[in-house]
Amino acid sequence: MKEKLKNILIWLLLAGYTVTAVALTDAKYKNIRVTGVSVKIDDNSHNKFISESDIVDVFKKENIKIDNKRMDYVNIHYTENILQDHNKSIRHAEVFRTVYGELGISIEQRQPLMRIINQNGDSYYIDNNGQVMPLSKKYTAHVIVASGYLNEPYMDHVGENMKLRMEKGNKSSGEIIPDLFKLVLTINDSKLWRSQFEQIYVNSKGDIELVPRVGNHIIELGSVEDLDEKLENLDAFYKQGLSQYGWNKYRTISLKYKNQIVCTKRI
């Protein structure tokens, strides 16, 4: 009983400290007015999904008026949530106040890993954390494209995380996108494969094919089962086989069979 009472008292003290700290913080900004907004967007030279004008547009749509507003009246958490909810290219938004009257906004963009184009032409990205994200009208990311016999539309995956589904093996029968996510993660983790593969195709049987930048052939991967082993075998074949016979000798190079590479010659 004493231990339980002790824990309750500690919790009450912490809660009281938090409330006091927030009150003191708000009091510090009581007589300061918002004089301007400073927006910082990370990696803006590489990914250009978001601009400062996009942030301004969200404020206008939500009727968020901050010019000359008292700093202590600015709802920090509400503003952060609004920004993240309205623009799915934003991974994280941090809003903070300064004693100089400037409202700071720091934006972390999502980093696309791959692009999906399904049979109906519906297209979307999956970022490097496995989160599905829509295309942007203002910027196209240069990432691996997966197309072919893919039926899963964007709306079926809104809010889903492919990384978690891949790790838990949580996918329905016939669903292949978590496997494609695993494949692209592996490709991007290798300097060789990152520079070699530019496109993924899923054929009518559900088998995965890789389209290389160098060489007039198709890599028949099949599935992502034993993926590391398959890519190691391909690396050895590239070095020992194609380097001798030429990069355009074969039409297909199949890795589908365990510990085997089966090639189809070009006629």
How should each PLM-predicted stretch be described?
Residues 1-43, 48, 52-53, 61-87, ...:
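Charged, solvent-exposed interaction patches on well-folded alpha/beta domains
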